[in-house]
Amino acid sequence: MLRINKLTKRFGDKTAVETATLDIDKPCMLGIIGRSGAGKSTLLRMINRLGDATEGSISFEGREITTLKGKDKRAWQSECAMIFQQFNLVPRMDVVSNVLHGTLNRRSTLATVFNLYPMADIHKAIEILDRLGIAEHAPKRAEALSGGQQQRVAIARALMQDPKIILADEPIASLDPMNAQTVMEALRRIHEEDGRTVIANLHTLDTARRYCDRVVGMRDGRIVFDGLPEQLTTGVAREIYGAGADFSEAATSTAIETLEQTDAVRTAEAYV
């Protein structure tokens, strides 16, 4: 299905991604973990064609992606939707209009300029928002929503493209644990119910283990781990993050229980 072969990206004399190879044969939820600067975001941007590879190739269902241009490239970006850490919504625009922006690649210039949306698309946008539990916010400005709600709007916008792949670049990095859980559960349901491939850059081990079928670890631009969640031991995590024996998974956790326990320990220590 999706094949990434020896993909490399250089910025001047700095190599951000080095000979990354990855095969996805069937729809799955794949998590990519690693410390900041490991090359996770650069890899996703190359898959989406937001950035060009220096070397290597990407193919999907036998079609070469790295050489696509113009209309064909835009069509691929509709098939391979992307959501970001900072949501990338239009703050003063209402929620449903932000979702409808997912159809821009297949609309005429005139329709885009005058915000002319077919009624069928409007109904579809509201149905998607309802599926994600935020239909009641459809007429509100995006800026009035919480971070978790805004990320679900961004997911809804991606679903308007009816993509085969969703790329999520640190989708929960700026969210509190409860909203992070809601967003990850939404992405997991989309994979399971729709049969879509979801590839998510994550910075927490517990999240990768809980929601992903497969986990890839990146360090210094290279893929250094590719396996099942249960194979992601603390020792393997140390190798991925380049950490020492004092490495603590709790420090990277988004689990509500773990964070509450950590806060309790800090409070207790303050009275010792």
Swiss-Prot record:
UniProt protein name: Phosphonates import ATP-binding protein PhnC 2
Catalyzed chemical reaction(s): phosphonate(out) + ATP + H2O = phosphonate(in) + ADP + phosphate + H(+)
Domain ABC transporter: 2-245
Family matches, as SUPFAM superfamilies: P-loop containing nucleoside triphosphate hydrolases
Keyword terms, alphabetized: ATP-binding, Cell inner membrane, Cell membrane, Membrane, Nucleotide-binding, Phosphonate transport, Plasmid, Translocase, Transport
Functional description taken from the UniProt entry: Part of the ABC transporter complex PhnCDE involved in phosphonates import. Responsible for energy coupling to the transport system.
Pfam families: ABC_tran
Predominant location category: membrane
GO molecular function annotation: ABC-type phosphonate transporter activity; ATP binding; ATP hydrolysis activity
